[in-house]
Amino acid sequence: MKVILLERINKLGRLGDVVEVRPGYGRNFLVPQGKAVVANQRNLEDFAARKAALEQVEAERLLAAQQRAAALADAMVTIALQAGEDGRLFGSVGLHDISAALAALGHEVAHSEIRLAGGPIKRIGEFPVRVHLHPEVELDVMVFVERA
């Protein structure tokens, strides 16, 4: 299935690229999410007419993400939980916990924008957590987990 991308998608293409995707991926994810349209003659003509407006919207989204990244660049989060003597937490620190801690510092970050490489944090220590604000804007935020 050929689709026209309406925004940049990692490992697939940029705005305006005509790419071949699996039918289920296009039909069930890209098209309903508004990330792509089916590549037929009519949609190609419509896209050519709307391309400048779409590029402007994408540039604004990138600028907003860069501004959020600049504000988050020096953010450090401290989360205190009960832990055993060996440093293992009674529970874990997940996406929602980190998102809530960032919100307490005044940074609105959705839990879907946070990437934990090895799953939830289950030990005391400091951990870099990847925050994915835009396909072109990612940064690491340090999370310090300490004993309560």
From Swiss-Prot:
Pfam families: Ribosomal_L9_C, Ribosomal_L9_N. SUPFAM superfamilies: L9 N-domain-like, Ribosomal protein L9 C-domain. One of its GO terms (biological process) is translation. GO terms for cellular component: ribonucleoprotein complex; ribosome. One of its GO terms (molecular function) is rRNA binding. Keywords: Ribonucleoprotein, Ribosomal protein, RNA-binding, rRNA-binding. PANTHER family: 50S RIBOSOMAL PROTEIN L9. Belongs to the bacterial ribosomal protein bL9 family. Binds to the 23S rRNA. This is Large ribosomal subunit protein bL9. It comes from Acidithiobacillus ferrooxidans (strain ATCC 23270 / DSM 14882 / CIP 104768 / NCIMB 8455).
